[in-house]
Amino acid sequence: NYGVKRSSGIVVETDSQHYYPQMPYYLLPNIQSDDITTEVKSNYILMPVAQAIQKLDSYRDTITIKSLLTTTEDAYIENDPENSTWSKSADSETGAFDLGVSITETVDDKETQIIYFSSASMLSSQIDQAISGANSKLAATALTSMCDVEQTVVIPSKSTSYTNLVFTQGAVNTWSIITIAGIPLVLVVIGVMIWMKRRKQ
């Protein structure tokens, strides 16, 4: 083994800034600094129905494990997603979980590298299009980093579609409040001010 295991359940995020609207199991993880993630650092990565990657208590000292994608501390593992109400229970395992890791092992000047992402659907066309190709860009960069070449040029296919705007659940909540309460309140205040001005005249 290479020092990691996969959790039995799926990861659910409760921080509204880190999941897709109304889908707390469609995760928008924190992107850690690494050569592999440099190209997508300013983008969102969408990880649907992902499992936590957990480090084993002990593994060979020749192995180095580095986090690439992580949840917030508010995430938890849902062991029964088919019957879930998507709310954290008292016995839920919580914390910041790895969703993507880079594993390297060097033995006798020979290096083994594994890059592991825990969402089987992250490269589906629908998921990738939702974030304007950031997932496929990350995968391409990961493959490039494992190739024994100085430089690999990756030319993405040209798209005639518009770039998608990605909103987190938190952003949706904020704009809902502004639309439902903020704008009408401003209009009422303006109306009162106009009425008072005319009354004085």
Label the model's feature ranges.
Residues 1-151:
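Acidic, S/T/G-rich, low-cysteine, solvent-exposed domains in lumenal/extracellular/periplasmic regions
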Residues 122, 129, 154-177:
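Short, aromatic-rich amphipathic segments at membrane interfaces
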Residues 179-183:
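C-terminal target-recognition/interaction regions appended to catalytic cores
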Residues 185-197:
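Alpha-helical transmembrane segments
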